[in-house]
Amino acid sequence: MSEERGMKEQTISEMAQEMAHTTSEGLKKRIRKLYTFDELPAWQKDNELILSGYVRETNSVKECLRAMTYFNNESINIYTHLIPGVAYLVLFLIFADLVLAQLLPGLDAGEHRMLRFYLLGAFTCLACSSCFHCLKQHSEPHSRLWSKVDYLGILAQITCSTISLLYYGYHSYPSHFVFFSTLTVALCSACAVLVLNDSFNTVAFRPLRAFLFMAFGLSGVIPVLAGSYQFGFAEWAARIQLKYVLYEAVFYITGALVYGFRIPERFAPGKFDMVGHSHQIFHLLVVLGTLCHFRAVTGSYIFICTGKHYSSLLMFI
């Protein structure tokens, strides 16, 4: 009887020790959420100049989403595009009808469509980017998939930006608008074919990716020069709000160069792991670029519909 009781006590003790060990290991896993570059699987190693702060392969959408609740080297990348993306979605839903229509009731409501078109493009770009940075650590297949989605979002943003501004710039010349819009869509399609190629999404093609998107963005220079020749510089600058378009270009080009050359972590590996590395700077500059274009396309819309700048209104936009 006592022997049987002793065996039961031993069994209970072993079970308790096993449960304690399991709990301890689970606690360690929960505490140890971040990893160094050297601890990552090969497919996750993208930027060897960022040495720590990584979320390791999760194989779980739930764990990827949970990573949004603690600070890691992707947190700023996620939220710098998630928050503005939600803001653009709200603007897409209410800006034209509840803001412009109230402040300037005489404007043609039908002309809102290209303004909405741009806001939808900005939302799509930022939403795709946020999803990529949130879900990229799931697994290699998911990372490749969401990387393509991210790049397609960028192409959508560039396309919507160019077409929306061309619409107001060539408002009274539909044939010009159709020609340059068709050219923009053709270039976008060519870039999309490359983006969907798996080889294009490897680390070796990082500089080429930056150059490609920068070149596609700069293709908008062609209709800008043509418009300046056709309308004269002063009128064309007013039609497309050229000053803000130039600001936008500066932000995008600077962001692409920072991303492509991995500045500043190139000069101090490990010092900018959590805050201040190139991809975070790139994200912030992209957001600033989208704001400049929003300002430009809104001003262009008002100018075309009224022939006036309404600077007192636009200073708040």
Curated annotation (Swiss-Prot):
Where are its TM segments located?
A: 81-101, 114-136, 149-169, 176-196, 211-231, 244-264, 284-304
Sorted keywords for this record are: Endoplasmic reticulum, Glycoprotein, Membrane, Transmembrane, Transmembrane helix
Q: Where in the cell is it found?
A: Endoplasmic reticulum membrane
Q: Which GO terms describe its molecular function?
A: signaling receptor activity
What GO CC annotations are associated with the protein? endoplasmic reticulum membrane
Which Pfam families does its entry note? HlyIII
Where do the record's glycosylation annotations fall on this chain? N73, N197
Cytoplasmic side residue ranges read 102-113, 170-175, 232-243, 305-317
Q: Signal peptide: which range, if any?
A: none
Indicate whether Methyltransferase appears among the record's keywords.
no
Topological domain (Lumenal) residues are 1-80, 137-148, 197-210, 265-283
GO process terms (BP): intracellular zinc ion homeostasis
Its membrane topology, per UniProt? Answer: Multi-pass membrane protein
The question of whether Ligase is a record keyword is answered with: no
Give the protein's function. Answer: ADIPOR-like receptor involved in zinc metabolism either by altering membrane sterol content or by directly altering cellular zinc levels.
Q: Which family does it belong to?
A: Belongs to the ADIPOR family.
The name this protein carries in UniProt is: ADIPOR-like receptor IZH1
Give the species this sequence originates from.
Eremothecium gossypii (strain ATCC 10895 / CBS 109.51 / FGSC 9923 / NRRL Y-1056) (Yeast)
